[in-house]
Amino acid sequence: MSIEIKNLSKKFNEVYAVKNINFTIGTNKTIGLLGPNGCGKTTSIGMMLGLIKPTTGDIIIQNKNINTFERNKLLSIMNFASPYVELPKKLSVKQNLQIYGRLYGVKDLSFRIDELAEDLNLKDFINKKTGELSSGQKNRVSLAKSLINKPEILLLDEPTASLDPDIGDYVRSYVQSYKSKNKVTILLASHNMAEVERLCDSVIMMKKGKIIDQGTSKEIINRHGRANLEETFLKIVRSEDEVA
């Protein structure tokens, strides 16, 4: 499914968290969203999920405005993973996945949970309470939760934060493979520049609620004459600071 963001803005108390952003994610494409804390990434994701009402602008999914979708329909096609969203601490990993699976109307739920536990290496702690897990384990559970309904659109916020390098690399490979097999459209918000270069077809850079550059990693790097995406991002952000 394709997503088009058109002139999207959100104000809180007369201050813009997001201001007039425009971009498109094609079907089975991954777009990376980069920016410092407070740049508007989380607000943008919240609007795309239908959790935050835009001040102005439109979100178009497969040529239909998000406002025309019933909540159940949105739940069936879209999901979200973030290590910063707390899971019920007193419930086990399995119980958490069961709850979310029922919420999303997943058929053959037991099989789906077993499948994700195998794919994301959750089996060793599937019956542990989430409050007893490490931050890296919680992150993998959050990713499993986001895939429970096999969404066509996946919004990922720092999916490999707090993961050991080997596990982080495994998760990145898994996301790549899952996208290819299931034709999933992905928005990836990350501070990991190498991760964005590896996983994303194109990149959006944000600061203070605005898009300051976008294109493929190669296009952006070449445009600013730097060696890699991290150097390029730092140059652009500092240039914006000097202008401000």
Q: Can you name each region flagged by the protein language model?
A:
Residues 57-67, 73-74:
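Conserved ABC transporter NBD signature motif
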Residues 129-133:
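Conserved ABC ATPase signature
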Residues 150:
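Conserved catalytic motifs of ABC-family nucleotide-binding domains
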